[in-house]
Amino acid sequence: MNIKNNHLVIMAGGVGSRFWPMSTPDYPKQFIDVLGCGRTLIQLTADRFQGICPPENIWVVTSEKYADTVKEQLPDIADDHILREPCRRNTAPCIAYVSWKIKARNPKANMVVTPSDHIVMNIAEFQRVINSAMNFTADSDAILTLGMKPTRPETGYGYIEADLSVPSTANKEVFRVYSFKEKPDLETARRYIQKNNFFWNAGIFVWNVNTVVNALRVYQPAISKVFERLFPYYYTDKEQEMINQNFPLCENISVDYAIMEKADEIFVLPASFGWSDRGTWGSLHENLPKDAHNNTQIGENIKLYETRNCVIHTTQEKRVVVQGLDGYIVAEKNNTLLICRLSEEQRIKEFSAE
């Protein structure tokens, strides 16, 4: 594998509505220091690919409204590597756009595509897995996805069912995908994890650029025609104008439905590196360190009394004192304070819309 051909694509167009009030449509969670470590989620995402993908091969696909924020937080990325979507069309058009643009400059490119708002605790193992995956796809026609080894019967993730009977001859860590499963109910999730060949779908994909472009041509010809028509305009002054005119013509469809569930050569690399998509306050509470009373605290000036099983998140200098709560979210940002039962956090979207 030639590292000069390795390209990282970060998808950063989401609005993070489940993480309100820290995350808002104007400033979603990928641009926030969720962990209180001094780095935002998108910065941490770029950080963990150091040594795998050269800095000049990093791409971010985002909304036009977030492009300036991306540049502020990742200043070393070239302007023409920040792709501005004029509207939201899910992950298939997003991946198609960046794939055709990369192919225009490097037809030998090997790509890893990742969301911008995930957390990885074991960086060394993550990098080992990514290197293994990219070695597998560099010279093959395979489409590879990472499958997280489940630690609990989770209903918030889709699942990948793998055929573990025979590993790939090219990489003993890689197995064929038998099927993709939608987010299950609790009973089904329990059944999945008992079988040992079901993995969480992390939404991290690895392939070479010719493989993904050819797959899009076969399974999504309408989307492919849009970006093939734009081929002469990539890296020119006309690119954004043509994208603004043509991108909205694409179907709103995820890459899972567009390619992954249709193609034949789909593989999974099962992995375990302390992964979480941190999509909810509950997952934040579950994965971060806790005090003796099972509270997660992020903030400089928090005092807790007779409080258990809570997640407290503040970003300002305000003093926060909590007494007598059990199982609550307490989150404060700007002029908004949220106090909500952890068990009812699915209602946060409802609260944020009011």
Task: Tell what function each PLM region has.
Residues 42, 98, 117, 160, ...:
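Residue-level signal for inorganic ion chemistry
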Residues 123-247, 267, 317, 341-342:
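Conserved core of the sugar-phosphate nucleotidyltransferase
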Residues 60, 83-84, 113, 144-148, ...:
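General beta-strand structural signal in soluble alpha/beta enzymes
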Residues 11-12, 61, 112-115, 145-149, ...:
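Short beta-strand segments
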